[in-house]
């Protein structure tokens, strides 16, 4: 992975966390605790599912050319 790609992934993660903490956390917790979320922070789009594979497939079906930040709602780590 090139330095540019690493930088882009770092930016994606930073923006994904910021979007979740500032805008999504208050509206998603506690109703969706434990579910997985795929976030496209530049478009401020997100997808939720109880299954990590299904949430990835939903996100890619809607936005096939985008990259996503993945998390588990209400948890520090997805696994």
PLM feature spans:
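Short, charged, surface-exposed hinge/linker loops at domain edges
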Residues: 5, 12, 73, 78-79
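Amphipathic, hydrophobic secondary-structure cores in small proteins
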Residues: 33-75
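Short N-terminal "domain-start" leader segments
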Residues: 1-31
